[in-house]
Design a protein with these regions (language model features):
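Short amphipathic, positively biased membrane-proximal segments
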Residues: 1-355
Length: 355
């Protein structure tokens, strides 16, 4: 590779990084005012009811989402402001859109390489296009409340990823030897379909967060939305690291930069898990900045993968072959999408620690 080509590759990586910074900076989170924070900090929670009253409320038909909270004697979760709720939902829509875009391009390349020999291989393309459209619609929608089209599309995306994982597992098991390193390296990527499921889950979470019910904080599956999102983002990042680690191990980590996506994102995953399970704190500045670095890593990774395509015989002049055989260009932004979801979780928890 010539010096000129290396320079072009570096400029491309910097340009992609600039795009990532612009995306992260767009529509940034505006925390509550200092006066509101001080009043919230001074406010005392209502006294817990006696144990007998808690037991009676738990078994007397109280709302399922609030039974455990009442039984433990925890204070009820105050409602998050509508503006903060919609803002977090739009960030989740951007997360779902990035994941859907990565799935669309990656599955198109990989399934084209497989000659679409199974008609089901067209399904992730159609579903990811619909998911991207729903994400774009949600990003531009400043209203609260669920949208039936987006809700249906995200549910279909979640189901598609689960079914696709079954297809990929079947592809591996039908090869000689079954689950051996050779088949895990060169068979259908076992973790890839879960990316469209993550897009669907993030989009569904956005609809839950948007759902405007006065007097209560947003909840997902009956649990506080902020903590649930942090846990979901943590699991998604960790699963993506596993897939990346397998493929970079196949590449023998010949470039030291290949260690970055298996070292930085696990820290982000651990920080988000601490956010989900740890004590309620308003200031998680280190977690926020580490998530921003993880998001930036997704864009910079595209530049490294473009350099990997250039290293193959013929470089970009032989793009029709090297795009199929080189490192997948659309894969790294999955980290960006999941980091954005983690940032949305932090936004909710900063506005209201019980959300």
């Amino acid at each position: 590779m010539t010096t000129k080509q290396a320079g072009l590759g570096l400029l491309g990586s910097l340009a992609l990084g600039a795009i990532g910074v612009a995306l992260l900076g767009r529509d940034g989170h505006e925390p509550l005012s200092a006066r509101r924070r001080m009043l919230d900090a001074l406010a005392l929670p209502p006294p817990a009811p006696p144990p007998l009253e808690r037991l009676r409320a738990f078994g007397a038909g109280a709302a399922p989402a609030g039974r455990l909270t009442r039984w433990l004697g925890l204070p009820p979760s105050p409602a998050v402001s509508r503006a903060s709720r919609v803002q977090a939902a739009r960030r989740l829509n951007r997360s779902a859109g990035l994941l859907a875009s990565a799935v669309l391009l990656d599955s198109a390349l990989e399934h084209y390489r497989g000659s679409f020999r199974n008609p089901a291989m067209y399904t992730p393309l159609a579903v990811s296009v619909l998911s991207l459209a729903a994400a774009l619609h949600g990003t531009g929608d400043r209203r609260s409340g669920r949208h039936p089209f987006r809700t249906a599309v995200y549910a279909a995306a979640t189901t598609t990823g689960l079914v696709g994982t079954g297809f990929h597992i079947y592809n591996i098991t039908r090869r000689p030897g079954g689950f051996v390193w050779q088949n895990l390296f060169y068979g259908a990527p076992i973790g890839a379909p879960m990316a469209i499921s993550l897009a669907g889950l993030m989009g569904s979470a956005a609809e839950h967060v948007r759902d405007d019910r006065p007097g209560r904080a947003p909840r997902i599956f009956g649990l506080p939305a902020g903590r649930m999102l942090a846990a979901l983002s943590s699991a998604g990042i960790l699963g993506t690291v596993g897939e990346v680690g397998l493929l970079h191990f196949r590449g023998a980590y010949h470039n030291p930069a290949m260690f970055l996506p298996v070292t930085m994102p696990p820290v982000a995953s651990a920080l988000l898990l601490n956010t989900a399970l740890g004590p309620a704190r308003r200031d998680r500045w280190f977690t926020r900045w580490w998530l921003r670095l993880t998001a930036l890593l997704g864009f910079v990774g595209v530049g490294f993968h473009a350099y990997g395509v250039q290293r193959n015989m013929g470089g970009w002049r032989n793009w029709s072959q090297n795009l199929l055989n080189g490192p997948p260009l659309p894969a790294p932004p999955s980290f960006t999408g999941l980091a954005l979801a983690g940032l949305a979780a932090l936004d909710l928890l900063e506005d209201e620690p019980h959300a």
